[in-house]
Every structure is written in C-alpha cells, then in structure tokens.
Curated annotation (Swiss-Prot):
It comes from Corynebacterium glutamicum (strain ATCC 13032 / DSM 20300 / JCM 1318 / BCRC 11384 / CCUG 27702 / LMG 3730 / NBRC 12168 / NCIMB 10025 / NRRL B-2784 / 534). The keyword Glycosyltransferase applies. Keywords: Glycosyltransferase, Magnesium, Metal-binding, Transferase. The keyword Oxidoreductase does not apply. GO terms for biological process: mycothiol biosynthetic process. Homodimer. It catalyses: 1D-myo-inositol 3-phosphate + UDP-N-acetyl-alpha-D-glucosamine = 1D-myo-inositol 2-acetamido-2-deoxy-alpha-D-glucopyranoside 3-phosphate + UDP + H(+). Gene3D superfamilies: Glycogen Phosphorylase B. This is D-inositol 3-phosphate glycosyltransferase. Belongs to the glycosyltransferase group 1 family. MshA subfamily. 1D-myo-inositol 3-phosphate binds at residues 9, 20-25, 78, 110, 134, 154. One of its GO terms (molecular function) is magnesium ion binding.
C-alpha cells in the first residue's frame, strides 16, 4: 500500500512548539513512522519554506517528506496560505507525473490540506481520509476573548470536507460529537483513532535523571516546579497559568515555586514578550522562566524537572503534551475540554479544572503542590496510564482504516465542489 499524506501548512519535520508546529506535527510524523515500519509506503507532502530544502527528504525506509514549492518561501502567514492551494496542488500533480508515482489512498491533515486532498481524490479516484485536528466552530466556541475568531471561510471549507471525505478520522468520541453537532457529520463515516505517545522516549527516569534535569534548567532541587509546554498563543492558555500563579503568590508570598513556560510565538495575537510583560505587571516575573521550544530529546528533561504540568488550553482534540508529561512520570492539571478528559485520568493521574478562572486554577495547583503523597502517587499512576497509548497502536488502527477504505472504494469523481 502507498499513501499520500498531506500537511500543506506545516512540515512534520519542523520543531514543535513554535509557529504553526505543534501536536499535529508530532502526530503525523509519529504515525507515518509506525506505518512505514509496517511496510506501508508513505509520502508526506508539505509546502517548502526554504530554498535550501531538498525536494525529497528520506526520513526512513518507506517514509519520505516531499517539499512542494508553492508561493514565496517566507512571508506568508497561515491565514494567507489559501491563496497557494492551487499552486500546491499543481506542484503535487507535477511531482507525481514526473516521478511516475501513484497512490492507493490520500490522508489529509487540517482543512487546508483537506481542500487539496479533496481535489486529488476526485482526479486520482482513490479514497480520501481526512483528519481535522482542530475545527473552526469548536475553536470559536471556546476561544479566549483576546484571541481572533476563526473565519467563516474556514468553516465553509471544513463543512465541504465533512460532506465529501470518504472517512473522517477523529481522536476521540468528543471530537466525533463535535463534528456531528457543528457540521451535521454522518456518524457512519467517522472513525475514532486514538493518538499515542512515545513511551520509550518520554519515561520517568530515576531520581538522578530528575536531579540532572533540574541542574540543566538551573532550578534548585527542593523548589516546586510547574511547567507549561506549547505554543505561546491565547488558545493554549499560558495567560491562565500566569494569572493563577500570581493568585498563588498573593495568597502566600513565600511559596517556594518556580514556573517554566516552554514554547515559541504562534499567530498574530501574542509573543513571548506579551507573556513576560503580563508576568511583570502581576509581579511574578522572577518566578517564571521562559524557554525556547525544545526537540523531544531535550523536552523530556522539562517534563521530568516539573512536579506538575499545566495544560490550560481552551480546547484540545486530544492533548499530546498531557500524555507526554504523564509518560515522563509527571501528573497533569488540565482544562476539562475536548479530549483532555480522556488523556488525563481525573483523580488518578492528575486533575481537571472547569473553566479558566485564575482562582480555580490556583486552587487546583495548590491542591497538588501541597500534597506530596498524592502528587507522587499520581505521577506513578500517570506512567502506567500513558503506556496504554502508543503510536504503534495508533498506526495499527490507521492501517485497518486504510484497508477498509480501499476495500470499500467507491470514488466516482462526481462530488460537488460548489
């Protein structure tokens, strides 16, 4: 089997945690790697962003990333990329003709890629599986007041994909309900495929490893640490954590606590300086350390150094950061939204918070920070919980889904593009 994956707006090889690179990038590369191990040939098509990028990057046996030139390498925001969908589609067609490569199935990721996949599906007459990862209607329902709403144009494009893709692959039952509620999706064309985590890389280590992680980050061994990992944008909620930490210090100015915020700028509404200034205004700038995004091999040290990882997102289709943290032996406090109640076993591997009130978050943080016995037990249970999720299992589900889609292939090129 040969699969064309499409990730038009962001390369799976890009560093997660900055720009448009995040959990989706991890998902695509991790599942493609595992599918390739099963003998499935996977080409991931993405838009070239540097002239120095080779057109074909061989990642592993059976796995390639294809960089397609479409528009200028730099200077285009994600919001401007719809102007390059035709160029990107044309680039894919030119590449496949020149290389004489054909595919059995298309798997598109995110709505921009889905629009490309929809057209190619009809041209090539092969099945299209689409994974949205995020949805405009859901983001607009949960967004923070400081965040820019998603456009009606995006919602329309998503509706077209819901109506025309052969299979809609979702991360959780919650996401399935969102598709049905907001987009009137046919439940018979929706399949739940649970994401995973790299439980070999993200592991708790031992006391010596934790001490080494703290030394590398310049954190005293006996200081409590709360970490945030993710893109610095309002939708991910770093402002919620900063305000909650300020509330904690208002209650107890002598609290022995440090906060790590690890991530880079993303989108038009915030930069690291935005959150540094917020911390200064709230008087907690000396308690918070900002770190640039780190590759997975270094990110595990951040998870291990933390006593708690906070995930105050306004929505997550699953929550890979929560799963990686738990695999590393660290309990999680997360918002009760999207797929996070599945990623975090409430009361066993962490806590879930209703809403985004800084005081509610301060209460949750204090509950675990001040109860060493419960926090340590949750960290131990978190490791076992995370081990029930793996990328190999995710890929096995996808492989089965692919085979079913090919077996049930009924693509006649008659879909409505109006």
């Amino acid at each position: 089997m040969r699969v064309a994956m499409i990730s038009m707006h962001t390369s799976p090889l890009q560093q997660p945690g900055t720009g448009d690179s995040g959990g989706m990038n991890v998902y695509i590369l991790s599942t493609a790697t595992e599918l390739a191990k099963q003998g499935i040939e996977v080409d991931i098509y993405t838009r070239a962003t540097r002239p120095s990028q080779g057109e074909i990057v061989r990642v592993a046996e059976n796995l390639r990333v294809i960089n397609i030139a479409a528009g200028p390498y730099e200077g285009l925001s994600k919001e401007e990329l719809p102007t390059q969908l035709a160029a990107f589609t044309g680039g894919m067609l030119s590449f496949t003709r020149r290389e004489k490569v054909t595919y059995d199935l298309i798997h598109s990721h995110y709505w921009l890629s889905g629009q490309v996949g929809w057209l190619l599906r009809d041209l090539w007459r092969i099945p299209l599986i689409h994974t949205a990862h995020t949805l405009a209607a859901v983001k607009n329902s949960y967004r923070d007041d400081s965040d820019t709403p998603e456009s009606e144009a995006r919602r329309i494009c998503e509706q077209q994909l819901v109506d025309n893709a052969d299979v809609l692959a979702v991360n959780t039952q919650e996401e399935m309900q969102d598709l049905m509620h907001h987009y009137d999706a046919d439940p018979d064309r929706i399949s739940v495929v649970s994401p995973g985590a790299d439980v070999e890389l993200y592991s708790p280590g031992n006391d010596r490893a934790t001490e080494r992680s703290r030394r590398e980050l310049g954190i005293p061994l006996h200081t409590k640490v709360v970490a945030f990992v993710g893109r610095l944008q309002p939708f991910k909620g770093p402002q919620v954590l900063i305000k909650a930490v300020a509330a904690l210090f208002d209650r107890d100015p002598d609290r022995n606590l440090r906060v790590i915020i690890c991530g880079g700028p993303s989108g038009p509404n915030a930069t690291p300086d935005t959150y540094r200034h917020m911390a200064e205004e709230l008087g907690v700038e000396k308690r918070i350390r900002f770190l640039d995004p780190r590759p997975p091999s270094e990110l595990v040290a951040v998870y291990r150094a933390a006593d708690i990882v906070a995930v105050p997102s306004f929505n997550e289709s699953f929550g890979l950061v929560a799963m990686e943290a738990q695999a590393s032996g660290t309990p999680v406090i997360a918002a009760r939204v999207g797929g996070l109640p599945i990623a975090v076993a409430e009361g066993e591997t962490g806590l879930l918070v209703d809403g985004h009130s800084p005081h509610a978050w301060a209460d949750a943080l204090a509950t675990l920070l001040d109860d060493d016995e419960t926090r340590i037990r949750m960290g131990e249970d978190a490791v076992e919980h995370a081990r029930t999720f793996s990328w190999a299992a995710t890929a096995a589900q996808l492989s089965s889904l692919y085979n079913d889609a090919i077996a049930n292939e009924n693509v006649d090129g008659e879909t409505h593009h109006g």
